[in-house]
Amino acid sequence: MLGAPDESSVRVAVRIRPQLAKEKIEGCHICTSVTPGEPQVFLGKDKAFTFDYVFDIDSQQEQIYIQCIEKLIEGCFEGYNATVFAYGQTGAGKTYTMGTGFDVNIVEEELGIISRAVKHLFKSIEEKKHIAIKNGLPAPDFKVNAQFLELYNEEVLDLFDTTRDIDAKSKKSNIRIHEDSTGGIYTVGVTTRTVNTESEMMQCLKLGALSRTTASTQMNVQSSRSHAIFTIHVCQTRVCPQIDADNATDNKIISESAQMNEFETLTAKFHFVDLAGSERLKRTGATGERAKEGISINCGLLALGNVISALGDKSKRATHVPYRDSKLTRLLQDSLGGNSQTIMIACVSPSDRDFMETLNTLKYANRARNIKNKVMVNQDRASQQINALRSEITRLQMELMEYKTGKRIIDEEGVESINDMFHENAMLQTENNNLRVRIKAMQETVDALRSRITQLVSDQANHVLARAGEGNEEISNMIHSYIKEIEDLRAKLLESEAVNENLRKNLTRATARAPYFSGSSTFSPTILSSDKETIEIIDLAKKDLEKLKRKEKRKKKRLQKLEESNREERSVAGKEDNTDTDQEKKEEKGVSERENNELEVEESQEVSDHEDEEEEEEEEEDDIDGGESSDESDSESDEKANYQADLANITCEIAIKQKLIDELENSQKRLQTLKKQYEEKLMMLQHKIRDTQLERDQVLQNLGSVESYSEEKAKKVRSEYEKKLQAMNKELQRLQAAQKEHARLLKNQSQYEKQLKKLQQDVMEMKKTKVRLMKQMKEEQEKARLTESRRNREIAQLKKDQRKRDHQLRLLEAQKRNQEVVLRRKTEEVTALRRQVRPMSDKVAGKVTRKLSSSDAPAQDTGSSAAAVETDASRTGAQQKMRIPVARVQALPTPATNGNRKKYQRKGLTGRVFISKTARMKWQLLERRVTDIIMQKMTISNMEADMNRLLKQREELTKRREKLSKRREKIVKENGEGDKNVANINEEMESLTANIDYINDSISDCQANIMQMEEAKEEGETLDVTAVINACTLTEARYLLDHFLSMGINKGLQAAQKEAQIKVLEGRLKQTEITSATQNQLLFHMLKEKAELNPELDALLGHALQDLDSVPLENVEDSTDEDAPLNSPGSEGSTLSSDLMKLCGEVKPKNKARRRTTTQMELLYADSSELASDTSTGDASLPGPLTPVAEGQEIGMNTETSGTSAREKELSPPPGLPSKIGSISRQSSLSEKKIPEPSPVTRRKAYEKAEKSKAKEQKHSDSGTSEASLSPPSSPPSRPRNELNVFNRLTVSQGNTSVQQDKSDESDSSLSEVHRSSRRGIINPFPASKGIRAFPLQCIHIAEGHTKAVLCVDSTDDLLFTGSKDRTCKVWNLVTGQEIMSLGGHPNNVVSVKYCNYTSLVFTVSTSYIKVWDIRDSAKCIRTLTSSGQVTLGDACSASTSRTVAIPSGENQINQIALNPTGTFLYAASGNAVRMWDLKRFQSTGKLTGHLGPVMCLTVDQISSGQDLIITGSKDHYIKMFDVTEGALGTVSPTHNFEPPHYDGIEALTIQGDNLFSGSRDNGIKKWDLTQKDLLQQVPNAHKDWVCALGVVPDHPVLLSGCRGGILKVWNMDTFMPVGEMKGHDSPINAICVNSTHIFTAADDRTVRIWKARNLQDGQISDTGDLGEDIASN
C-alpha cells in the first residue's frame, strides 16, 4: 500500500423539491426553510439541521453536480472509489436527481447526475490522453465498464441481461454477492458492458432504465418499485508520475527508472444508487403486488437505516454492523464505512403533508454524516509493491547518506543524535557557494585579460612585420588567430593538469581500496603492443636528435663565413629567420599542446568512466546487501504469516533477485564495452603518434631547406623535442597505471560471477519453497472442501428433518381445519333444523318477512358470539400450547438448582437481600425506561394521527372551496355579480377559508409538538441501558430475565384478550351492518314496487338513489373504467344492492364487477347473501355470471354428464368446486382475470328469467310448501369425490385443462389422458346457442385431440396444422374433419408451424430447431435447421425421447417463423435477430438485425417480384421494417423504425393492404400506415390482458383480436371502433389463423375453435344489449 488509508466522512446533501401543483391546489403549506449562505435547513419553526450542502427549491441540476459530484469523478482518475445515492420518501425527486428515469424529451438543463457524470468522465479521458501526447509520454489506456443492477423484492436483477424473462421477476436470480480479501464487494453473474464512448454509455443507461420496474401509486404517477444501482468501472494504465529531483539525484535506481517509463494500473468504481422511496401503504393506496413491493422496499430501507445508525452512532461503532440483513446494504457495504468517497443526497418534500417523512429523512441524513470511510487508492499489487519498495529505498538511502556525511551518529549507549559536524558542514557549504561566486567573477576577469594579452601580442607581431615591410592584413589576422589559439590551449592545459591531479588522487584512493578485490593482474596483448610502439617512438626521437646536432655543426660553419662577407645582410636575414622560427615554434608548440590536451581529456574521460564503473559496482553491492537483509527479514516474517502471504513474499523476492541478476549481467556487458573502448582509444593514440612523426619529418625537411641555421634555433628545437619526450613518458606511465586498473577490474569479474551463481541458487530455492507452499495450500483447500461437504450433508439432513416436521405440522393443521369445517356444518344444520320446526304458509311468510329480518339478528348474534366463543376457545388452547415451552423453560433449571439450595440456606439472608435490592432497583430503572419509550412512541403516534386527520380535513375543505369557487364563477357568468347566491357562496367560502387557516395553525402546532417530543426523546436518554446490563451480575441477570419473561407473557396475554374482544366486536358490527343492509334492501324493493304507481314516491326514491351514488368509496380501486357506476334509469334496480353494500362497507376492493340484483333468499337471510357473494368472488374460473348456490346445485344434480351439451357444461360448476359453500376459496388465481358482466338491463332480464324458473321448481318440489322462501338452503347431497389430486384440482380452477375433462366427475384423469393420446383427434360440430347471433362470428366446429395447450395454428382451404405443448404437430383434414397425421419427436413445445403450398413442406419450430417435413407420402423429417444457421439431413432431434428444456450453446430460442408469399424464403426469429433461409438450397443467407430484445413475432409481405417486406416485433417494445431483395446476403439493417413504440413487448402483427396492425403486452392495439410509415390510430386498453393474436376476417374489412383472458374482439378497420366481443375460450388465446372462408383460434384449453363470419352490415351491430347477453351466456 502507498500508506495508511485516509479517513473520509460521508458527505450529505439535502435537496428540497418544489411543491407539486396538486399540493398547491390542496392547500399544502411549506414547512422547510433554508438559511441563506449557510448549509442549514429549518424544519417547522425552529428545528435546525446542518449538512455539507443544502439545495433549496430553486436549485438546478448543474449546481448540484458541480458542488457535489464533480470532485468525485476527478478522484476516480486517481484510483478512488465513489458512491452517490439518493435517499428519501417516494415522490421526493430521487430518480429525477440521479437521472435514471431517462426521459427522451428531456432538456439539457434537466439532465441528471449520471448523464452529467458520464459526459464529464469521457471528456476527462480525452483531455488526459491529449496532455500525455503533448508531453511526449505514452497515452494512458482507459477501460470503462458499466453494470446496471435492480434490487426488486430482495432479488438482484441484471437490467443489461436481455435473455432474462421480464415477467419472471419474482423468480430467484442467479446473481451472487461476494467480498474480496480487502473488504471490497463484487457480484458474480452480472452482465458487464464495455463502453468506449459517451453515446454507448447513454445507450446502456437507456436500455437499463427501460427495463426497470416502475408503477403508479396514489403519491407518484411513475414510482420506482425497486432500488437501482448503476456502476461504472474505470481501469487506467498510465505512466508513473515523476518523483522529486532532489531524491532522484542520489538514487541511481530511481534515475534509471526515470529513463524508461514505468506504468501503474489504477482502478475505480463509481456507484450511482437510486433508492426506491420509503412509503406508507395508507398514503400510496398500494394493494397486491404494489403492496408487496412497498413492503420489500421498506424492509431494505429499514436495514439501510440500521446500518447508518450502527455506523453513525459513536456509542455503537464497536458493535456489529448488520450489513447482511438486506441485499441492499450488502451491495453498499464498501460505500458505507468502507473504501469509498460517499455522498448521500437526501431528497425531501417541503409540504407539511409529508412532515413526518421529511423529519425521518433529515434525522437519518444527519446521522449518516458521522460515518467514517477508509479511502485508499486502488492500485495493482505490483505498482503498490514497487512504490513501497522505492519509497523504502529512498528513505534508507537518505538515512545511509546522513550516516556517511556524519549528520547522524550513534553514541556508546546506542542513542541516535545529530552530529555537530553537520552544522559545520552547512557553514562550509555556504562558504563554498560564496567562493564559487568569487571564482566565477575571477574567471570573467581572466577571460578579459586573456583577450587583452592576445590583442597586445598580436599588435606587437604586426608591428614587427610592418617594420620589416612584409606585413599585410592576412598575415596579421593569421597571427592573431594563432596567438588566440595558443592562449586558449594554455588555459586548457592548466585545466587539464588540475583535472589530472584530481584524478591521480582518486586513483590513489582506488588503489588503496584494491586489496578488497584479491587476484592476479594480467596484461592484454593490446597493452603490450602499445608499449613496444612507445619504445620505438623514443628510439626514433633519439636518432632525430643526433641528426639535428650534426646539421647544427654544419650551420655554425656556414654562418661564420656569411658573417664575414656581409654583416648587414646577415642581420636582416637573421631577423627574418627569427620571425620564421618563432612562428614555426609557436605552431609546433600549439600542435603539441593540443595533442597533449586531447590525450589528457581522453584519459580523464577514461578515468571518470572507471570511477563511474566503481560507483556502480559499489551501489550494486549495497543493493545486494540490502536484498540479503530484506531476505532475512522476509524469512522471519514468513514464519508468522499464513501461506498466502508467504507465497506473495517469495514471489516478490524472486522478482527482486532476478532483477539483481539482470543488473549484474548488464554490468558485465558494460565492462566488456569499456574494454573495447579502451583498446579503441589506444589505437587512436597510436595514430596520433604517427601523425606527430609525420609532422616532425615535415619540420625537419623545412629545416633542411634553409641554408643557414643558428645554434639557438637548434637548441630550441632540441629542448622542444625533449619536452615532447617527457610528455610521452608521462603518458606512458599513465597508460600503464590504467592498464593495471583494467587488470584489477578483470579480476573482480570472477567475484561477480560467484555472486551471480549464489543469487541464482537462492532463486531456485525460493521457487522450490513456492511450490511446496502451493502444495500445502492445495491440501488445506482440499481439507476445507471436505469439511464443507460434510457440513453441507449435515445441513441437508437437518433440512430434511425440518421438512418432515413441517409436513406433520401441516397435516395436523389440515386435520384441525377439517374438524372445524365439520363442526361448522353441523352447527349450520342444527340451526336450519330449528328454523324448520314451525312451517308457515306463503301468505304468512310474506307478512312476517320484516319481523323475521329484524328478529333474526339476535339469533345471528348468538351464532356469531358462539363462533367467537369457539374461536376464543381455540385461541386459548393455542395460547396454552404456546405457553408450554415457557413453563418448561422455567422448570428446567429446577433440578440443577435443587442441589445448591442447601448451600444458599447455610448462608445468611443478608447477601440475598442485598442482591435482590440492587436487582430490584435495576429492574425498576429498566421498566421505567421501557414504559417511557412506549409512552413517547404512543404520544408521537397519536400526534401523527391527529396531524393526518387535520390534513384530511384540510384537503376536504380545500376541495369544497374549489367547488364553490367554480360554482361562483358559473353563477357570475350566467347572472352577474348581483345574484344573491353569489353573496351566500362568498360567505361560505370565507368560513371555509377561516376553517382552513385554523386547521393550518393546528397542523403547525402539531408539528411543533412532534419536534419537541423528538428533542425530548434525544435529550432524555440519560439512562444508558447497555451500561446497566453490562454491570449486572449473573444472579441479577437471571432476576431481570425472569421479570422480563413475566412481563412479556402478561403483555402478550393482554394483547390476545384485546384482540379477541376486538374480533367479537367486529363480528357484531358486521352482523349489524348486514342486518341493516338487508332491511334497507327490503325497504327499497317495497318502495320501488309502489313507486311505479306513485310518482311522488318515485321522485323521492330517485333522490335517495342519487344520494347513494354520491357516497365516496375509499376501498374501491379506480384503475379501470369498469368501476364507474352506471346511473341510468334502467340500471337503478341492478345497482341498488351494490350501493347499499357500499354504504355498509361491504364492497371488496378486488372485485371489480358490480354485484347482481339480490334474490329473495338473500333479501330475507343475510347468510345466504354472504355465501352467494363469496361464491361470486371466490371462483373466478366459472365461465359466466354465477347462478345462486341452490340453482347451481340443482343444475349439478339434475343434469347428466353424458347428455349435457357444451353450452350446459359451461354453465355448470367445475368438479373442483367444494361441496360446501363455506369452504369456497375467496382468492382467485393470479393468472385469471375478471370476466366482464353484461349491462344492467341484460342482467335484470336474465335474473327475472331465473326467478321464474326457480318459482316453477319450487311449485313442483316434494314438500308442497314454500319452506324454501323461509329457510336457508340445506346442505347439498353428498356427491362422489373427484378422483383428481390436489394439483389437478388447482389446475382445473386455473382453467388450464379442458372443460370436457373437468365435467367428467366419475372418470379418471390419467386414464382419459392416455386414451386421448392414443386415439386420433377429431373435429366436432360446436352446438349453437341462443343469443350468439348478435356476435359477428359464429363458432361452428371445435378440434380436439391435443393433450396440452395449443400454441400455434396454420391452415389452407383443405388442411389445418396445429402445434402444441405436447411436443406434436397435428395435421387435420378440413373436409373429413379428422386428424391425418401427427408430427412428433420435438424436444419441447411446438411454438410455430407453417405450410408451403408450392412445395407441400411443413415447417415446425421447437426450441432452437426448425424441422422440415415432407407430408406427401408420409410424415418424414427431411431436414433440420438450427438458429445458428446449421443444416442437418434428416431428424436431428429424434434421439430426444423426453422433454429437453436446455438449449445447446451457441443457439437461441426460435420464437416464430414466416414464409414469403412465393415460398422461396423462410424467416426465423431467433434471439434479437431474424435469420434468412433460401429454401431452394436450404442455406442461411444472412440475418436481419437491429432489435435490442428478443424478436417475438414477424410477418412477411411482398412489395414486388423478388422483394420481400418483413415486419418484426420485439420485447424491446419496437416494431421494425426490413426490405429484402432477392439474393441479399449478410446482415440487413432495418429501413424504418415505427415510432412511438408500445409500452411493452409486441405479441402479434398482421398486414392488411397498406395497413399494419400490432398487438402488445400493454393491452393495446395500434394501426400503422405502411406507405407513410406513420401511426394512424391506437386503442390503449383494447383488452384487459395481453393481446396475443391478431387476424383479419375473410371477405370483410374487420380485424379480429384475441387476448390472454380468452376474449375475442372484432374491430372495424376503417374507424378502428369495436364491433363486438365475446368469450372465445376459457383460457388464453395463443394464435389466430384464417383461410378463405373460416377463422381458427388456438388456446390453452387444448382445442382449436373454427369460426365463420356472419353477414355484417358495415361492421356494426345495433343491439349491444343482446351482445352483452351473448357474452354472459357464453
Curated annotation (Swiss-Prot):
CDD domains: KISc_KIF4 (cd01372), Rcc_KIF21A (cd22263), WD40 (cd00200). Keywords: Acetylation, ATP-binding, Cell projection, Coiled coil, Cytoplasm, Cytoskeleton, Disease variant, Microtubule, Motor protein, Nucleotide-binding, Phosphoprotein, Repeat, WD repeat. SUPFAM superfamilies: P-loop containing nucleoside triphosphate hydrolases (SSF52540), Prefoldin (SSF46579), WD40 repeat-like (SSF50978). ATP binds at G88, Q89, T90, G91, A92, G93, K94, T95. Residues 1146-1167 are annotated as: Interaction with KANK1 and KANK2. Residues 9-371 form the Kinesin motor domain. The keyword Phosphoprotein applies. The modification Phosphothreonine is found at T1664. Changing C28W: In CFEOM1; prevents the interaction between the motor domain and the coiled-coil domain, expected to cause loss of autoinhibition and gain of function. Changing D352E: In CFEOM1; de novo mutation. Changing R1154A: Very weak binding affinity for KANK1 and KANK2. The modification N-acetylmethionine is found at M1. Disulfide bonds: none annotated. It comes from the Eukaryota. Residues 851-865, 1128-1138, 1170-1179, 1196-1205, 1288-1297 have a biased composition (Polar residues). One of its GO terms (molecular function) is ATP binding. GO terms for biological process: anterograde axonal transport; cortical microtubule organization; microtubule-based movement; regulation of axon guidance; regulation of microtubule depolymerization; regulation of microtubule polymerization. Residues 598-637 have a biased composition (Acidic residues). The modification Phosphoserine is found at S524, S1212, S1225, S1229, S1239, S1662, S1673. The coiled coil region interacts with the kinesin motor domain leading to autoinhibition of the motor. Belongs to the TRAFAC class myosin-kinesin ATPase superfamily. Kinesin family. Processive microtubule plus-end directed motor protein involved in neuronal axon guidance. Is recruited by KANK1 to cortical microtubule stabilizing complexes (CMSCs) at focal adhesions (FAs) rims where it promotes microtubule capture and stability. Controls microtubule polymerization rate at axonal growth cones and suppresses microtubule growth without inducing microtubule disassembly once it reaches the cell cortex. This is Kinesin-like protein KIF21A. It comes from Homo sapiens (Human).
